[in-house]
């Protein structure tokens, strides 16, 4: 069987031979393997999301909501050092998040002291207009909470939605033309646009996850970099 990026198996030092190169992804993966706590799928989801967002947004504090291990927040700082700090927020922060963070700091000492992990509700962090709000697979209506918080602060935002809840999210009457999940994401994009945002709609590779639609937004006419 091939090496599937969609696998939920943890990456460990046994996988180091799969990342023998000198690319940034190789270096990140090597650190993740040393930590021996992160599902393979989470590495690829975070990497593909972060690099697409960094092509558009620089600067600002990173706020990673429903962050899990907080890899996305840390990748944003690894990819571009113009963000001074990052906050990774989740109701429950996995104990192994600290293990992963130490492995990344060992490789990139400049991360030390710049990542804050908060085990708290997603609305516990005050959002600033200069922030970049991000979330990978915030389940169901949590994606809508992330968008609402970004819109209220006029902050930049990027979400990779999953687990679409047809009963609680808005498909906008579009389900006769497209599947419910796509209809809900279309309405999310339109909500950003209606709030005065410029939007970018992208996808990450489908072999990582079928829930691969990436929605990115910044206030139209505002600064993309901050």
Regions found by a protein language model. Give the residues of each.
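Class I S-adenosyl-L-methionine
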Residues: 1-226
């Amino acid at each position: 069987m091939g090496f599937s990026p969609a696998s939920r198996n943890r990456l460990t030092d046994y996988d180091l031979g799969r990342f023998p190169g000198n690319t940034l992804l190789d270096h990140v993966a090597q650190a993740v393997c040393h930590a021996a706590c992160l599902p393979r799928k989470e590495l690829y989801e975070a990497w593909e999301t972060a690099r697409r967002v960094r092509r558009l947004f620089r600067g600002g504090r990173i706020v990673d909501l429903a962050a899990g291990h907080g890899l996305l927040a840390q990748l944003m700082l690894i990819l571009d050092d113009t963000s001074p700090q990052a906050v990774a927020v989740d109701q429950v922060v996995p104990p192994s998040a600290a293990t992963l963070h130490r492995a990344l700091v060992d490789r990139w000492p400049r991360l030390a002291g710049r990542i804050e992990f908060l085990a708290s509700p997603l609305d516990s962090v005050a959002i600033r207009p200069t922030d970049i709000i991000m979330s990978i697979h915030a389940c169901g209506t949590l994606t809508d909470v992330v968008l609402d918080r970004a819109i209220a602060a006029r902050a930049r935002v990027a979400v990779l939605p999953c687990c679409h809840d047809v009963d609680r999210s808005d498909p906008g009457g579009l389900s006769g033309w497209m599947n419910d999940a796509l209809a809900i994401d279309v309405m999310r994009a339109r909500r950003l646009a209606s709030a005065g945002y410029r939007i970018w709609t992208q996808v990450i590779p489908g072999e990582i996850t079928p829930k691969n639609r990436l929605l990115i937004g910044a206030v139209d006419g505002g600064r993309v970099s901050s």
